Amino acid sequence: MSEILHRSLTRPVRVGNLIIGGSNEVIIQSMTTTKTHDVEATVAEIKRLEEAGCQVVRVACPDERAADALAEIKSRINIPLVVDIHFDYKLALKAIESGVDKIRINPGNIGRREKVEAVVNAAKAKGIPIRIGVNAGSLEKQFLEKYGYPTAQGMVESAMHHVKILEDLGFYNTIISLKASDVNLALEAYTLAAKTFDYPLHVGITESGPLFSGSLKSAAGLGAILSLGIGSTVRVSLSDDPVEEVKVAKEVLKSFGLAANAATLISCPTCGRIEIDLISIAKEVEEYIQNINVNIKVAVLGCAVNGPGEAREADIGIAGARNEGLLFRHGKIIRKVPEATMVEELKKEIDAIAAEKMAEREREEQELANQSN
């Protein structure tokens, strides 16, 4: 997708062990729903998010109790930790000192210049970035009065205002988000922001709703934005278990070929030719590949006549027939299997291919590490 090349023009920003922006992959982020001061509950939820494929996690820091818990949380998780700060610069300083990987603030809301400068200097000293988070629902009064209501222009001007505060202090290690619950507004804001800034953009449709409707709304909004090559990190915001946010985000990225470390399932919608219980098989396989973290495409198809040819791009697949199934790789049949065991045989093939790809990835990573040394 040539439009995706836009992302290579953004300035790379390090967040923990990840490089965000530049020509790097789009990163999946989520946010905990626990009380941050409850370390056990927060770590447990983050571990679940990690397992689902979350790559960066954000926690709220509304008070001293939350700030006091950050170091312990950070020491017990494996992905970069981002902390959400509003208004109180002392909480930001404490979060930075605790070793978090990024903070999310709006400098204009922190207070006097010396307070902002203290936060910026602390972030510089630790080498961590700051995310400026503009939200249509909390746009500053000056921009609401100028435009009459939340607009893309007002949102980008708000971001420019906060960016200037940081740049005037010599700080450029910045990520920007411009979230709205209205898909068209978000699309317009991110499109304008991509033309205005060279900083990485964190994209999302905020307050998108419960699981079903929110997933569709997020997919529509994120899909439109990502199709323009805009976005270095993504979050799906749902009124549900945050693990579901990660699942939806992975599926959106996979749809655009932007998920380097995720398995994809393709399956047919069924018709009168079907001789197997394809729907239940597809659900079982989808669940099985959920936590496979390599780029593998799996097909589950109901028609043995057309199935293999229709899914020739799949790494591995199965096509059902009466009392049997055909296992195929890249459209070529490798063997017939009895219907009773075809799902288990498919899983074995999936595991073998995943192991091959994982080993190949590890070799490539080792070669890169050797070159850098």
From Swiss-Prot:
Gene Ontology MF terms in the entry: 4 iron, 4 sulfur cluster binding; 4-hydroxy-3-methylbut-2-en-1-yl diphosphate synthase activity (ferredoxin); 4-hydroxy-3-methylbut-2-enyl-diphosphate synthase activity (flavodoxin); iron ion binding
Leader sequence residues: none
Single GO BP term: terpenoid biosynthetic process
Cofactor annotation remark: Binds 1 [4Fe-4S] cluster.
Keyword Flavoprotein: no
Name listed for the protein in its UniProt record: 4-hydroxy-3-methylbut-2-en-1-yl diphosphate synthase (flavodoxin)
PANTHER family linked: 4-HYDROXY-3-METHYLBUT-2-EN-1-YL DIPHOSPHATE SYNTHASE, 4-HYDROXY-3-METHYLBUT-2-EN-1-YL DIPHOSPHATE SYNTHASE (FERREDOXIN), CHLOROPLASTIC
Family matches, as NCBIfam families: ispG_gcpE, PRK00366.1
Functional summary from the UniProt entry: Converts 2C-methyl-D-erythritol 2,4-cyclodiphosphate (ME-2,4cPP) into 1-hydroxy-2-methyl-2-(E)-butenyl 4-diphosphate.
Catalyses which reaction(s): (2E)-4-hydroxy-3-methylbut-2-enyl diphosphate + oxidized [flavodoxin] + H2O + 2 H(+) = 2-C-methyl-D-erythritol 2,4-cyclic diphosphate + reduced [flavodoxin]
InterPro entries in the cross-refs: Dihydropteroate_synth-like_sf (IPR011005), IspG_bac (IPR016425), IspG_bac-typ (IPR004588), NO2/SO3_Rdtase_4Fe4S_sf (IPR045854)
Similarity section: Belongs to the IspG family.
Gene: ispG
